[in-house]
Amino acid sequence: MMKSTDIIRYRLHNQQIAGTKLRNPLEIVERLGAVQAQDYSGGLWGIRLRLPGSKLVDIEKALINRKIIRTWPMRGTLHFVPARDARWMLELLTPRVIRRSAGRYKELGLNVDE
């Protein structure tokens, strides 16, 4: 059985919080797949936490240069994702979000097909 300290160490490593070898915001977001960014500054912090010595401008530069974009591929929640992955993520996940929102659409008098 694993010790709780080992579990904590593995989680920190796998989440790129400790011991990362990644060098820039894009590599972090690619490795994680997405970073939750419903709160913009919280999303920036989530990336910066994983890049010791990085500056906010480094992350914002990746956004300005469209290496990373902020979109809502999962659960209707905003995330930072690699720009080159956004299309397939949205194509894969949007139908599920729409299905799960059907009740709310009906309440609002919206038609999914419109």
How would you label these PLM feature ranges?
Residues M1-E114:
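Phosphate-backbone binding and catalysis cores of DNA-processing enzymes
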